[in-house]
């Protein structure tokens, strides 16, 4: 189940965009070979709130666009399909029969700022940040150049499937 919870009132987000986020997350999970019932929470917030969370969780006292809180552990350089695709999850991993992949906290305010800065649509920015974060929940990272190239390629492949271009 995908849970999208809009906890801010500074930026309007329409039902079509929310539905696109839901669809794009489900597509990404399928493409990444996540075949079990899953739970992903997407919490939409403002800049002040994400700054607080960033300070509390990462000790970085500044606004960021999106934060990912994965529930599964991955060996360095490995993703869900390499580690967990055929894994038999016991009850400790499940919540009411769903595998909890993690939480995504996204600042719609920052997404709007970045969409203007980068010269593309708000929809594109919100979808990009969401997919970026979903891939983090699935073990992708971008700390090393080779990992970054792989992650960026996956992000663009998923966005292109939905005709979401820069």
From Swiss-Prot:
Highest rank taxon of the organism: Bacteria
Binding, Zn(2+): 132, 136, 142
GO molecular function, one term: RNA endonuclease activity
Physiological role: Single strand-specific metallo-endoribonuclease involved in late-stage 70S ribosome quality control and in maturation of the 3' terminus of the 16S rRNA.
E.C. designation(s): 3.1.-.-
Organism: Clostridium novyi (strain NT)
Primary location class: cytoplasm
GO biological-process terms attached to the record: rRNA processing
Keywords: Cytoplasm, Endonuclease, Hydrolase, Metal-binding, Nuclease, Ribosome biogenesis, rRNA processing, Zinc
Free-text remark on how the cofactor is bound: Binds 1 zinc ion.
Record-stated family: Belongs to the endoribonuclease YbeY family.
Cofactors demanded by this protein: Zn(2+)
Cellular compartment(s): Cytoplasm
A single GO cellular-component term on record: cytoplasm
Name under which the protein is recorded: Endoribonuclease YbeY
Residues spanning the membrane: none
PROSITE patterns: UPF0054 (PS01306)
Xref: InterPro entries: MetalPrtase_cat_dom_sf_prd, YbeY, YbeY_CS
Pfam families: YbeY
Cleavable signal peptide: none
């Amino acid at each position: 189940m995908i849970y999208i919870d809009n906890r801010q009132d500074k930026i309007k987000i329409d039902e079509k965009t929310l539905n696109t986020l839901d669809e794009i997350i489900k597509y990404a999970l399928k493409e990444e070979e996540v075949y079990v019932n899953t739970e992903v929470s997407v919490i939409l917030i403002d800049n002040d709130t994400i700054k607080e969370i960033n300070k509390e969780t990462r000790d970085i006292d500044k606004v960021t666009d999106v934060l990912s809180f994965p529930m599964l552990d991955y060996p360095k350089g490995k993703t869900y399909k390499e580690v967990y695709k055929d894994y038999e999850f016991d009850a400790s991993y499940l919540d009411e029969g769903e595998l909890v992949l993690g939480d995504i906290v996204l600042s719609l305010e920052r997404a709007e700022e970045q969409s203007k800065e980068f010269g593309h649509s708000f929809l594109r920015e919100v979808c990009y940040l969401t997919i970026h974060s979903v891939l983090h929940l699935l073990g992708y990272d971008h700390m090393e150049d080779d990992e970054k190239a792989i992650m960026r390629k996956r992000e663009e492949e998923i966005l292109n499937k939905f005709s979401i271009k820069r």
